[in-house]
């Protein structure tokens, strides 16, 4: 009986020793899983190793990669925040952090973050989208229109582009009705080929030139030759503005610039 008890105790010691001594085998197996792209298995294995070697670093990085590959960038950010100096941790952290900033409406900050990432992943597209959101919020419609278009089908960029185009077009029509032809011209030109923007821009340009020409005539009749000259010279190519500028220029002793 005593002999059996001793054998059982010896067997128990051997079992305990095999469980607690030399975790390097488990570590190496976890590293192999990581190298094979089996990040979920690797994360679980490294987490079981506790503080052994740099298992915590591998565990956080692997867990981050699992979420990253699933497109869960916001959820992955805290994991990469722990390992910013490990492998591609910093780059992946910045990419995920940009998504966090975007989700929180910090579009200027997100744009700066994605811009700094250069051609990493789709950072260039994400920069355009967030820059457009920031520009639109600050009434910089020209930048917003361009960047939404460059953002393509990311998120709701296409919908926002269409909505903004409609808004700008309606504003241009209102300005045109108010005879603010220069401002309307700017907006229609900004819209390019959207709807009939090109034709409306042409009409606004004609009205604007007519108005400026009439203004120059008034200045001339009131004796303001310099003011009339400045306007006529700016209208070079329109009606007889070039001839009028030349005539007034001779009266003022100004040589008309050569226009090819």
Could you tell me what each predicted segment is?
Residues 1-5:
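Positively charged n-region of N-terminal signal peptides that target proteins for export
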Residues 15-18:
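C-terminal motif of bacterial Sec signal peptides marking the signal peptidase cleavage site
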Residues 23-34, 57-68, 91-102, 125-136, ...:
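Alpha-helical tetratricopeptide repeat
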Residues 48-50, 82-84, 117-118, 151-152, ...:
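Alpha-helical solenoid scaffolds that mediate protein-protein interactions
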